[in-house]
From Swiss-Prot:
Gene from which this protein is expressed: C
One Pfam family per UniProt: Hepatitis_core
Subunit structure: Homodimerizes, then multimerizes. Interacts with cytosol exposed regions of viral L glycoprotein present in the reticulum-to-Golgi compartment. Interacts with human FLNB. Phosphorylated form interacts with host importin alpha; this interaction depends on the exposure of the NLS, which itself depends upon genome maturation and/or phosphorylation of the capsid protein. Interacts with host NUP153.
Ranges annotated as biased composition (Basic residues): 149-178
Any one Gene Ontology cellular component term annotated for this protein: host cell cytoplasm
GO biological-process terms attached to the record: microtubule-dependent intracellular transport of viral material towards nucleus; symbiont entry into host cell; viral penetration into host nucleus
Keywords linked to the UniProt accession: Capsid protein, Cytoplasmic inwards viral transport, DNA-binding, Host cytoplasm, Host-virus interaction, Microtubular inwards viral transport, Phosphoprotein, Repeat, RNA-binding, T=4 icosahedral capsid protein, Viral penetration into host nucleus, Virion, Virus entry into host cell
Chain positions with Phosphoserine modification: S157, S164, S172
Region described as 3 X 8 AA repeats of S-P-R-R-R-[PR]-S-Q: 157-179
Region named RNA binding: 179-185
Post-translational modification, as annotated: Phosphorylated by host SRPK1, SRPK2, and maybe protein kinase C or GAPDH. Phosphorylation is critical for pregenomic RNA packaging. Protein kinase C phosphorylation is stimulated by HBx protein and may play a role in transport of the viral genome to the nucleus at the late step during the viral replication cycle.
Extent of the Sequence repeats: 157-163, 164-171, 172-179
Protein name: Capsid protein
């Protein structure tokens, strides 16, 4: 069976494969980030979003994989075989879990559309011959605001990005349209 865990989120394994393996933080760092940002939603019995569900599943898979690796480490007598198993888990399974955790944490943090735009931008950048591409790769946190898809209220015209030079700006602070970290779901 050829199952792509990113398909329902608009991405593919191939799209994530453009990112080098050392791009992804360690599993420990990703788990700490998920816990710090989304612990309440992840532990909640309520359904929050498909990304929360996928993140829960990836975390549970990692816990089970570590349980298996510990068992193998304790029960496999041959050190060479033990090293082969540990290296395989760290190299192959570890990378897949790091990719999954990064993708879903990033989608929850930056928004799915922004992450997909980043993956496409990076994929284009990495496939462009070095002589024809900018020296620095795209950075997720610095993608232009225009990549974020925003809802518009019906019946209202879109707001201007810059005020007219003849008009004074309102004294009230501008509201941010991004989702606050307080509301996890």
């Amino acid at each position: 069976m050829d199952i792509d865990p990113y398909k329902e989120f608009g991405a593919t394994v191939e799209l994530l494969s453009f990112l080098p393996s050392d791009f992804f933080p360690s599993v420990r760092d990703l788990l700490d980030t998920a816990s710090a940002l989304y612990r309440e939603a992840l532990e909640s019995p309520e359904h929050c979003s498909p990304h929360h569900t996928a993140l829960r599943q990836a975390i549970l898979c990692w816990v089970e994989l570590m349980t298996l690796a510990t068992w193998v480490g304790n029960n496999l007598q041959d050190p060479a075989s033990r090293d082969l198993v540990v290296n395989y888990v760290n190299t192959n399974m570890g990378l897949k879990i790091r990719q999954l955790l990064w993708f879903h944490i990033s989608c929850l943090t930056f928004g799915r559309e922004t992450v997909l735009e980043y993956l496409v931008s990076f994929g284009v950048w990495i496939r462009t011959p070095p002589a024809y591409r900018p020296p620095n790769a795209p950075i997720l946190s610095t993608l232009p605001e225009t990549t974020v898809v925003r809802r518009r209220d019906r019946g209202r015209s879109p707001r201007r990005r810059t005020p007219s030079p003849r008009r004074r700006r309102s004294q009230s602070p501008r509201r941010r349209r991004s989702q606050s970290r307080e509301s996890q779901c």
